[in-house]
Amino acid sequence: MISHGKDVKVFCGNSNPHLAADICKFMGTKLGESEVGTFSDGEIFVSLYETVRGSDVFVVQSTSSPVNSNLMELLIMIDALKRASAGRITAVIPYYGYARQDRKAKARDPITAKLVANMLTAAGADRVLTMDLHASQIQGFFDIPVDNLAGNPIFVDYYAKKFGANCENMMVVSPDVGSVARARAFAQKLHMNLAIVDKRRQKANSCEVMNVIGDVRGMDCIIYDDMVDTGGSLCNAAQALIDAGGAKSVCACATHGVLSGPAIERINNSVISEVALLDTIAPIDAGKSDRIRYLPVAPLFAEAIERIYQEVSISKLFR
């Protein structure tokens, strides 16, 4: 890609510096010089070691675990850039934390996804670039442009190369009713049929698989979702496909590998042969499982950043 010298600058916090470096590599530019650290009392500080006056600045920072620290790093860096007279600031948030708190599920609940949107805007962000928001309506929580990239083209390319034309006995599976639209779009691109696992969630981070909708008997199934958190939903869905549905095998893919708590242990002990994830969240404990495979998002984000900088449509990236 074209290098734009001082006119475009990419900075990052501590959440995923390797992704930021890879994005810069594909863009043909270097990562901006900065320091993001903490004082002795835990307060976060940001120091910028190069001028950003008038520059089109992109800050790469996933708000993954530790969520609050990474979010504060992002907000403080945006504020520092704004006060340093950056021309435009784009918050590049490959994984947007707090996205699951997008509505009032019960009385007196906060809508934290909206609060985070307000904080990013107040800090000085001029636009947001993210990927596979857990709830697409979060785009409407902002009064600034939000580009929500889709991760499924990366998975489509991966599985097309992996299985080639041998897709007759394969089926895409939505792990719950709420993910049907996302899984259907993925299945259509792979020219596969769709099945659904109907589940009833008893409490947060636990679920009970109830029924398999669709004939998966003897099929090789690909479960498709936007994230893997504790792995409970994923592993229960996979077990249901084998036990209740009679599936031949199960693999899975998801955009965001949160992998909190017992997730990796559950995956290792499950019937799932492979879990393909995108590296929107830095793969910290992935080495503990040979079933987890990471696919790079840097090329897609680099192209999106180039297009935003050049004021060119990015709609092509959503197809």
Functional labels for PLM-detected ranges:
Residues 1-319:
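PRPP-associated nucleotide enzymes
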